[in-house]
A protein has these predicted regions:
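Hydrophobic cores of alpha-helical transmembrane segments in multi-pass inner/ER membrane proteins
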Residues: 1-4, 69-85, 151-164, 221-241
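Alpha-helical transmembrane segments and their helix-start/interface "positive-inside/aromatic belt" motifs
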Residues: 2-31, 97-112, 170-185, 240
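Alpha-helical transmembrane segments of multi-pass membrane proteins
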Residues: 29-47
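Perimembrane loop-to-helix junctions flanking transmembrane segments
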Residues: 45-64
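Interfacial helix-start motif at the membrane-water boundary
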Residues: 59-78, 106-110
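Hydrophobic alpha-helical transmembrane segments of integral membrane proteins
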Residues: 102-137, 186-210
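Membrane-proximal helix-loop-helix units in multi-pass membrane proteins
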Residues: 112-178
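C-terminal transmembrane-bundle signature of multipass membrane proteins
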Residues: 180-255
């Protein structure tokens, strides 16, 4: 009997861990390995099948990705938001301090994965796109670089932003009431790069500026991309809540 009791107690303690980073590490590994595979695919088929949009191989190796990723990302974003809303805490104001602390740690993990996803999309693949267009004369708006950058990496980090926002909104008391301006900026700002893509491609039909990547037409990418810095405001809000949860005694122990 005592053995059974101790086993149950150990299991309860295991599920009561405040800092469990396994979810974050799994997310980071999956994300980075996926993008490394994508980059290798680009290297191989960008030159072999990505230079002529009228060629059959372009349809096979590139447009097939485009027609698959767009609905998949849309469904994933809606499904994630729906799941987080459906499983929301119906009595979030009554959550225990220890559980709230655990949820804050989970939120930080969401934001970490989001930050890495933004790096891949708004930095790595975006800079790569500039290099591509300074090297290759395109005959379509749906270049291999764009199919990966605009229609894969941007929606992926936007889906993660949806997850982070809905997680905070449905499970953490501090964010459940009202809306955090910093959180709205960090979630919506980088997403707005996607509508900006429409303006960008429209502009390219009138002005040739592949070699002028700093042209005003491209400023929207920078403006909305830098809104990701709103994450510092969210982190300050999280730290303020942690300070309130651990109290003066906890702060003194950490000082």
């Amino acid at each position: 009997m005592s053995s059974t009791t101790s086993t149950a107690a150990g299991a309860a303690a295991g599920t009561d861990t405040i800092v469990d980073l396994r979810g974050m590490w799994i997310g980071l590994v999956v994300l980075n390995v996926f993008y490394l595979i994508v980059r290798i695919y680009e290297q191989i088929y960008g030159w072999r099948a990505g230079l002529d949009s009228f060629a059959p191989e372009f349809q096979t190796y590139w447009l097939s990705i485009l027609w698959t990723e767009i609905p998949l990302e849309l469904v994933s974003g809606i499904a994630l938001a729906g799941y987080l809303w459906k499983t929301r805490d119906r009595n979030v104001d009554a959550v225990a301090p220890r559980e709230e602390m655990r949820r804050l740690v989970v939120l930080v993990q969401w934001l970490t994965v989001y930050g890495i996803a933004i790096y891949w999309g708004a930095s790595f693949f975006t800079e790569q796109d500039g290099t591509w267009h300074m090297t290759v004369i395109r005959d379509t708006d749906f270049t291999p670089s764009h199919i990966i950058e605009f229609y894969m990496s941007y929606p992926i980090y936007s889906v993660i932003a949806v997850g982070a926002f809905f997680y905070a909104k449905t499970r953490i008391p501090y964010f459940a009431h009202g809306y955090s301006l910093a959180f709205l900026i960090v979630a919506i700002g980088p997403f707005m790069i996607i509508p900006n893509v429409g303006l960008n491609e429209w502009g390219h039909t009138f002005w040739f500026m592949e070699e002028l990547f700093v042209a005003p037409l491209h400023w929207g990418f920078v403006f909305f991309g830098w809104m990701a810095l709103g994450v510092f405001g969210v982190v300050l809000q999280i730290l303020g809540r942690i300070h309130a949860l651990i109290g003066k005694e906890g702060v003194a122990l950490l000082a």
